[in-house]
Amino acid sequence: MVNIVVFGAGGTAGSRIVREAFDRGHRVVAAVRRPEADAPYLPAGVRVVTGDATSVRSVRELAPEADALVVAIGGGDRTLWPDAARTVLDALRGMPAAPRVIHVGGGATLLDPAGTPLLDDPDFPDEYRDAALGQAEALDVYRSSADGVTWTYVCPPPLEFHPGERTGRYRTGTDQPVTDAAGRSVLSYEDLAVAVVDEIENGRFRNMRFTAAY
């Protein structure tokens, strides 16, 4: 059994990660900004607490309970994700037995065959660009860290990523999208949660990013 704290546990990705981890028998703490609003939608038996990944104090209060700390936050402006990355690293720096950090990132940070980030493509949808830039900055924060905190940055597909079915199947890659025979990169939120919890259990991608798709 792994002790897991999930920041953003009330969100689309975070809530599914909570359920996947809980269903596998792990001890899960769901950190949300409004416990009274989110608790009814999370599994009974999960402890729901007030938590903010952009607060050093909040992270330090919850980190001692965790073997893995998941950052699955959304909303707000593009500064949210790099601010959270810096905060979490600052909070864990120097902590004995600091938990691993699993950051649910942005698929647009992945690279095309020429090595260019997908978010730099002129055809990349404008409505997603701001969040993509913020997630790219968060990845840079993790990559530039040298404080002994182990992190993993998880990329869903760049565009075709929606709530759907849990199949328990996916394939992984590192710097480029994983595509099917038709050239599409697709994954459900439910199977992203499977990939995240698999990574918590197995630790294949330490101090690097990975992506998952069918």
How should these model regions be labeled?
Residues 140-162:
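Conserved beta-loop-beta element that borders a ligand/cofactor-binding pocket
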Residues 103-143, 154:
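Catalytic loop of short-chain dehydrogenase/reductase
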Residues 71-104, 133-137, 141:
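NAD(P)-cofactor binding segment of oxidoreductase domains
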Residues 31-36, 52-53:
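N-terminal Rossmann-fold cofactor-binding loop
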Residues 47-66:
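Conserved Rossmann-fold cofactor-binding substructure of NAD(P)-dependent oxidoreductases
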Residues 115, 148, 161-168, 199-208:
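Glycine/proline-rich active-site loop of Rossmann-fold NAD(P)-dependent oxidoreductases
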Residues 7-10, 101, 175, 181-214:
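Mid/C-terminal beta-alpha module of Rossmann-like enzyme folds, strongest
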Residues 4-24:
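N-terminal Rossmann NAD(P)H-binding glycine-rich loop of SDR-like oxidoreductase domains
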